[in-house]
Amino acid sequence: MRGHKTKWMRTLAVAASLALVATACGGDDDGGDDATDDAATEASTDDGGDDGGGEASGLLAELQEAGSITVGIANEVPYGYEDESGNATGEAPEVARAVLSGLGIDEVNAEVVDFGALISGLQAGQFDMIAAGMYINAERAEQILFSDPDYCIGEAFAVPEGNPLGLSDFQSVVDTPEATIAILSGAVEEGYAEIAGVPSDQIELYGDVNAQYDDLDAGRVDAVTGTSLTVLTQVNARDGIESTESFFPLDENGEEILGCGGFGFRNDNQEFRDAFNDQLNTMQDNGELIDIITGFGFAAEDVERAQELTVADLTG
């Protein structure tokens, strides 16, 4: 568990704190996932929040003074969506509420955008952070900062009942030239399909999660890919479709890719990210988040996997 790893890393962080000060303060101008950002991330993840007791500044101070924040979501159940009353809920917004409350920010509002517009919307200042269960990877970490993960989960396909084409993973799509698969634009599944060699004419890209499943219902696509939990949520809400078994996609070297989600921040808001991360880690180590996350259908092991990892582990 990361709780043990955290204690070990805290010892290193204290010993190296003077050497890391300049690195941590200057590591965000280019947004790159380089050694500077990794060092800053490790310091923020593992120093237990001991930043000398100084007052917050920048965006964090503004949010604390206002007591409210706007987060970006993509209306994807169960990760981040609006309920029937128009209130933001889901795994990520509810975890964010709990963590932000510990930072003195009690009101969480949401802006709904297409998944592929989350990063650009954050960068443009449309909202203050991303709380959409976004997977952490090196490509995205070149554009924004991430927290440590709060869940890790596999992939699955939604297919018509009986799975008439026998689809089970991306390689099975390659092996079935007549199959067309729906993928959420900007999601990691685009990359998974590319690595597997799925031809572009077998892929339909969508900006909206529900539209993918509407087209599956109508027979316009043969499968929808997504996290196993997204697929299961949709399958349980619709007639005539089923989920394949969960699987982990493969990278260029044939190694399984572990999909882990976290929270996104602008590159110039490292102080905010660091404070959020410290509070997140504390609540993970204390077991305060597991009921929130499993309440949205995640398994306990999905939460426990994430506790063993940091953002640096996922971005290289």
Language-model segments: which ranges?
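C-terminal motif of bacterial Sec signal peptides marking the signal peptidase cleavage site
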Residues: 20-24
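Extended ligand-binding regions for polar small-molecule ligands
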Residues: 26, 93-102, 163, 187, ...
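Short, low-complexity, disordered segments immediately C-terminal to signal peptides
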Residues: 26-58
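Extracytoplasmic small-molecule ligand-binding "clamshell" domains
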Residues: 54-132
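Bilobed "Venus flytrap"/periplasmic-binding protein-like clamshell domains
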Residues: 70-78, 88-103, 155-213, 223, ...
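Acidic, polar ligand-binding/catalytic clefts
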Residues: 97, 108-172
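A ligand-binding cleft/hinge motif common to bilobed small-molecule-binding domains
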Residues: 134-142, 192-195, 222-257
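Periplasmic-binding protein-like
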Residues: 152-156, 237-277, 300-316
